[in-house]
């Protein structure tokens, strides 16, 4: 920064443009200042007190008292707009410095922005030079930008009243320090997103484009439903392909549990009052907008007591140091990074599929390369596109009825890998300090962990519990910057890692989020739920808020340690204070609100059992506190099914058993249901293979209390165990090709029929070879003589060579052995059905043109099949087809489906015949349902509704009555329909030459004579 005599301010402040701010953001080292009074050095730039000038690309730096005060500059007033101005450049050489003056120019306001325009010639390195009035020598602004398209240059002007507003009011300004990023660093826009997309190694599937950059668009409907409703503190910055995912992990009510309740009245009376309290979250557009727009609140300024806040942050750092929180490392080992990834999660907004599929074909070198590139992106401050979606989960019925569903903001892979390098080691050490420091992150609630937590709250004190409302979206940049400062304090000294860490938290606050309507939004506050350190960061911010609240009341660090006990986990917090300090609870809500947090501390009690923390309540069992969920929440595990396999269902029931321990009656009822379930045939095989675990009472007691089981308790299990039981599933089976033959295969065994017929049959008859009705004997011979003879009933061959078979040269051209075994499925041979290859080609083409994955195509195929049931599969259909999303119609173009259907759409849809028939039958089981095809044909018999669609495939199994109805409906549909092979050819000339010769005697132009008749008189 070039500093001139006219540029320096009287109150010991230096004015700087964003290049200076960027320099301060990226360094912990020295700052050198040179001017006419000598040179100055500031060794730690993070200790500088900085004020951001609102609406201007400039900052004020308040210098230490040792910095010499200099002559002040005056501001621009409106009368000087037409005056000419020049600038001064002061060059500092090794031994001398000189002052140079450049050419002059008039200046004009730029318009709506914060810059003014001048036309003085510039070159690189001139940023920061002052513009000086030629008339009076006053500094009126500082040069900042040059235009790439014209000769214009831009400078930041001193506003009217600058001296009064800033210089004379210096003590009342908000002077900030410890800022590791500032507005110029994070003022990215659409251009940054487009230029900073991941490199080809990341194999992205979706590209970011400018929101309003496309002048040509496909005329299919693309509704920007999030953008249209956006308002407040959010900015749209780009667009990319996206869609609202409405597929829920909760498949519906558990059919086994419903059947069990219908068969057992006692169980139904017990469970029904506890059911219905939780339901699957709603995944719709209004729910997304309702939760996502929590980010649009402005950041409130001038409410925080910065002295108390800085003291609070220092107090948290001191507390962690006192508990020997050690230096943390930047983890660059690829095996550690990839080993801790959730491979079942999605890759990111610009990618397709899950991580396990994405990494399946990569070797160790490819993975290490991706990690390096992710770190490089983070180091350069390049932003990844985060994905905003609705969270599919069970929620309280009140939240569901209010259409409140939580949004989830997931980090993309190109940011996630580098982020884990920065935060993983700190997080792991943070987990290990649970209950030592005032947090429970990393604590297990089992093995007496909850008892240890409750006992940490002193006896006789007044307890309180609270959790934050709209916590993630209410977090301010100030709090997240404080978390960054704590992390920087404990991280190893590596300048590359430090730059990555600072840029990561700049991205966390000022995040580009891809909404389901395809719009990319930039937010300016709040944490992201899908970043790799969400819980740790949220917990740290709650701890800072508690220290801040106490510091505002004048408490020292010793007072906090002696008079207050609290534990935080995410946005949850429990506290304990002495009775004489209960007044502190009355001040906490206001102090938290100053930091932007919405908390209520009215829930107070003297009993630990009445505290709620992380959705758990303490219960005293045998002198030990154990954590308990609400009974309704445990029953919801039984009520709702999210399993993909039978084994997953048994695991869910076992989880409910574990959570129910302590609720004696509830646990007993769950065990009864589990016993009934294992008696069903499909679960018997599962139990026989050891995949249906049994959880003993002794195991649950050990799990919760960490008290070893006594031998006398185990003896009770030994008494009922059957040690003679043969492992495995043994059943007596028999072949069904011929009962008598099968029974007689056991030599020496006498059947019941043999015994009854003993006196009526000859005793020494021989059994003929191959006989189906062997003569009974007292003892059946083990071996049969190959030369023996007996009575035999002959069997005719189904196809013999005596038949009139096709021959060539006297030789049968058929393979009779193969023909006897060749029994293909009839429908696979129908030429009215598309071949499997044609069907696969159609499916793949539609999938590509719709740009969907297999999971999304499954939903689309469901919707299209149901649409075709009602609307038919005529090749003349065009326009759009619709699918319902709740009460909303979603339109899809028909063109990709019809054009790619070879041979015809109806032949393609014949593959859906059985599924469509089953769907109609299912709908009819719930309420009367007749497809539109049947309504148009006036089909009155609802029993035939299952055949009332035009792509039904008639097979040998189709009943005669149904075949007749189908034929009649087709005849009715085609009545009066004719088609022309050729239409009118409009390209043929109809002109012809008239070669007829006429004379004056002709009767008229078409007749020469009247053939003897006289002309009219």
Swiss-Prot record:
Positions of the record's site feature: Cleavage: 219-220, 736-737
Swiss-Prot/TrEMBL catalytic activity: Hydrolyzes glutaminyl bonds, and activity is further restricted by preferences for the amino acids in P6 - P1' that vary with the species of potyvirus, e.g. Glu-Xaa-Xaa-Tyr-Xaa-Gln-|-(Ser or Gly) for the enzyme from tobacco etch virus. The natural substrate is the viral polyprotein, but other proteins and oligopeptides containing the appropriate consensus sequence are also cleaved; RNA(n) + a ribonucleoside 5'-triphosphate = RNA(n+1) + diphosphate
One of the record's GO molecular function terms: RNA-directed RNA polymerase activity
Residue stretches making up the RdRp catalytic domain: 461-585
UniProt PTM: Genome polyprotein of potyviruses undergoes post-translational proteolytic processing by the main proteinase NIa-pro resulting in the production of at least ten individual proteins. The P1 proteinase and the HC-pro cleave only their respective C-termini autocatalytically. 6K1 is essential for proper proteolytic separation of P3 from CI.
Active site location: 57 (for nuclear inclusion protein a activity), 127 (for nuclear inclusion protein a activity)
Classification via InterPro entries: DNA/RNA_pol_sf, Peptidase_S1_PA, Peptidase_S1_PA_chymotrypsin, Poty_coat, Potyv_NIa-pro_dom, Rev_trsase/Diguanyl_cyclase, RNA-dir_pol_C, RNA-dir_pol_PSvirus
EC number: 3.4.22.44, 2.7.7.48
Residue span, Peptidase C4 domain: 1-195
Superkingdom field: Viruses
Cross-referenced Pfam families: Peptidase_C4, Poty_coat, RdRP_1
Keywords annotated in UniProt: Capsid protein, Genetically modified food, Hydrolase, Nucleotide-binding, Nucleotidyltransferase, Protease, RNA-directed RNA polymerase, Thiol protease, Transferase, Viral RNA replication, Virion
SUPFAM superfamilies for the chain: DNA/RNA polymerases (SSF56672), Trypsin-like serine proteases (SSF50494)
Single GO cellular component term: viral capsid
Keyword Zinc: no
Biased composition (Basic and acidic residues): 746-760
Biotech relevance: The gene for the coat protein is introduced by genetic manipulation and expressed in squash so as to obtain virus resistant plants.
GO-annotated biological processes: DNA-templated transcription; proteolysis; viral RNA genome replication
Remaining remarks: Readthrough of a terminator codon TGA occurs between codons for Ala-267 and Gln-269.
Family classification: Belongs to the potyviridae genome polyprotein family.
Name this polypeptide is given: Genome polyprotein
């Amino acid at each position: 920064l070039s500093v001139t005599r006219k540029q320096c301010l009287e109150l010991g402040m230096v004015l700087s443009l964003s290049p200076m701010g960027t320099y301060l953001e990226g360094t912990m080292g020295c700052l050198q200042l040179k001017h006419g009074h000598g040179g100055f050095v500031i060794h730690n730039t993070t200790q500088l007190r900085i004020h951001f000038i609102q609406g201007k690309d400039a900052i004020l730096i308040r210098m230490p008292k040792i910095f010499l005060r200099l002559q002040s500059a005056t501001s621009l007033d409106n009368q000087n707009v037409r005056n000419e101005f020049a600038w001064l450049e002061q060059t500092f050489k090794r031994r001398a410095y000189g002052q140079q003056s450049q050419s002059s120019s008039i200046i004009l306001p730029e318009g709506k922005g914060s810059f003014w325009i001048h036309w003085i010639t510039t070159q690189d390195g001139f940023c920061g030079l002052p513009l000086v009035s030629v008339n009076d020598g006053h500094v009126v602004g500082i040069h900042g930008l040059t235009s790439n398209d014209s000769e214009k240059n831009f400078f930041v002007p001193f506003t009217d009243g600058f001296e009064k507003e800033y210089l004379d009011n210096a003590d009342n300004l908000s002077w900030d320090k410890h800022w590791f990023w500032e507005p110029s660093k994070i003022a990215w826009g659409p251009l940054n997103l487009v230029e900073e997309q991941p490199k080809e190694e990341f194999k992205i599937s979706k590209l970011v484009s400018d929101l309003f950059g496309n002048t040509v668009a496909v005329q299919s409907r693309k509704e920007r439903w999030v953008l249209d409703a956006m308002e407040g503190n959010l900015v749209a910055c780009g667009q990319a392909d996206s869609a609202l995912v409405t597929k829920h992990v909760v498949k519906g009510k558990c059919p086994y549990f419903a059947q069990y309740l219908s068969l057992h009245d006692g169980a139904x009376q017990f469970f029904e009052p506890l059911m219905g309290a939780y339901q699957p979250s709603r995944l719709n557009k209004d729910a997304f907008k309702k939760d996502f727009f929590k980010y649009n609140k402005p950041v409130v300024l001038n409410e925080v007591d910065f002295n108390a806040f800085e003291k609070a942050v220092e107090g948290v750092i001191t507390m962690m140091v006192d508990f020997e929180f050690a230096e943390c490392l930047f983890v660059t080992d690829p095996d550690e990074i990839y080993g801790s990834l959730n491979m079942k999660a999605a890759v990111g907004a610009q990618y397709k599929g899950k991580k396990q599929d994405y990494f399946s074909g990569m070797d160790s070198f490819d993975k290490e390369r991706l990690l390096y590139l992710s770190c490089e992106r983070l180091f350069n401050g390049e932003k990844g596109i985060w994905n905003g979606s609705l969270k599919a989960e069970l929620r309280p019925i009140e939240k569901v009825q209010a259409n409140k569903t939580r949004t989830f903001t997931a980090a993309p892979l190109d940011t996630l890998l580098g982020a884990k390098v920065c935060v993983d080691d700190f997080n792991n050490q943070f987990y290990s300090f649970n209950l030592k420091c005032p947090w429970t992150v990393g604590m297990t609630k089992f093995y007496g962990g909850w008892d240890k937590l409750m006992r940490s709250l002193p006896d006789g004190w007044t307890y309180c519990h609270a959790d934050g409302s709209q916590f993630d979206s209410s977090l301010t940049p100030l709090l997240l910057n404080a978390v960054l400062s704590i992390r920087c304090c404990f991280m190893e000294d590596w300048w590359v890692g430090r730059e990555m860490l600072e840029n990561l938290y700049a991205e966390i606050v000022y995040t580009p989020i891809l909404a389901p309507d395809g719009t990319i939004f930039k937010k300016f506050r709040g944490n992201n739920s899908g970043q790799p350190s969400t819980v740790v960061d949220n917990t740290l911010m709650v701890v800072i808020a508690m220290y801040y609240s106490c510091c505002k009341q004048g408490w020292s660090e010793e007072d906090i340690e002696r008079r207050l006990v609290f534990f935080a986990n995410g946005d949850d917090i429990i506290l304990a204070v002495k009775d004489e300090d209960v007044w502190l609870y009355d001040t906490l809500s206001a102090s938290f609100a100053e930091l932007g947090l919405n908390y209520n501390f009215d829930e107070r009690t003297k009993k630990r059992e009445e505290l709620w923390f992380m959705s758990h309540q303490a219960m005293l069992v045998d002198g030990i506190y154990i954590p308990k969920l609400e009974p309704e929440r445990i029953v919801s595990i039984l009520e709702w099914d999210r399993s993909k396999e039978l084994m997953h269902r048994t695991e869910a029931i076992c989880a409910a058993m574990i959570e129910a321990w302590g609720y004696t009656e509830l646990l007993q009822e769950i065990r009864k249901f589990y016993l009934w379930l294992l008696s069903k045939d499909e679960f018997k095989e599962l139990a026989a293979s050891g995949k249906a675990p049994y959880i003993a009472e002794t195991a649950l007691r050990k799990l919760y209390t960490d008290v070893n089981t006594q031998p006398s308790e185990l003896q009770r299990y030994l008494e009922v165990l059957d040690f003679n039981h043969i492992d495995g599933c043994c059943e007596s089976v028999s072949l069904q090709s011929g009962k008598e033959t099968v029974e007689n295969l056991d030599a020496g065994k006498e059947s019941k029929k043999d015994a009854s017929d003993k006196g009526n049959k000859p005793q020494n008859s021989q059994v003929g070879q191959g006989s189906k009705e062997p003569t009974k004997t007292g003892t059946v011979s083990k071996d049969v003589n190959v030369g023996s003879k007996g009575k035999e009933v002959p069997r005719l061959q189904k196809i013999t060579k005596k038949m009139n078979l096709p021959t060539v040269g006297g030789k049968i051209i058929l393979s009779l052995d193969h023909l006897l075994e060749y029994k293909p499925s009839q429908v696979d041979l129908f030429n009215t059905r598309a071949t499997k290859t044609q069907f696969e080609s159609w499916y793949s083409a539609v999938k590509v043109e719709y740009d969907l994955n297999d999971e999304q195509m499954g939903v689309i195929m469901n919707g299209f099949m149901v649409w075709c049931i009602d609307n038919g599969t005529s090749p003349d259909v065009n326009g759009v087809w619709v699918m319902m999303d709740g009460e909303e119609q979603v339109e899809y173009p028909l063109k990709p489906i019809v054009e790619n259907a070879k041979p015809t759409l109806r032949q393609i849809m014949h593959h859906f015949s059985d599924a469509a028939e089953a769907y109609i039958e299912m709908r009819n089981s719930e309420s009367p349902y007749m497809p539109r095809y049947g309504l148009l044909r006036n089909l009155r018999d609802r029993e035939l509704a299952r055949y009332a669609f035009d792509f039904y495939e008639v097979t040998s199994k189709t009943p005669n009555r149904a075949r007749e109805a189908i034929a009649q409906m087709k005849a009715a549909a085609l009545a009066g329909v004719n088609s022309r092979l050729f239409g009118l050819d409009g390209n043929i000339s109809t002109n012809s030459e008239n070669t007829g010769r006429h004379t004056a005697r002709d009767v008229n132009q078409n007749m020469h004579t009247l053939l003897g008749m006289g002309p009219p008189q």
